[in-house]
Amino acid sequence: MFRWGIIFLVIALIAAALGFGGLAGTAAGAAKIVFVVGIILFLVSLFTGRRRP
């Protein structure tokens, strides 16, 4: 999940340097979505992680 987030982040940073538009804007939107989903999954796993039986 974080690998995809990093890939989309790099694409989004390149898109930001060149101006958001078309496919670049879509990649930036996808990077935001993947980042938020990754953070939510991290927080869920943090609170429901390994507990002693």
UniProtKB/Swiss-Prot annotation:
It is found in: Cell membrane. The chain crosses the membrane at residues 4-24, 27-47. It comes from the Bacteria. GO terms for cellular component: plasma membrane. It is a multi-pass membrane protein. Keywords: Cell membrane, Membrane, Transmembrane, Transmembrane helix. Belongs to the UPF0391 family. This is UPF0391 membrane protein KPN_04833. It comes from Klebsiella pneumoniae subsp. pneumoniae (strain ATCC 700721 / MGH 78578).
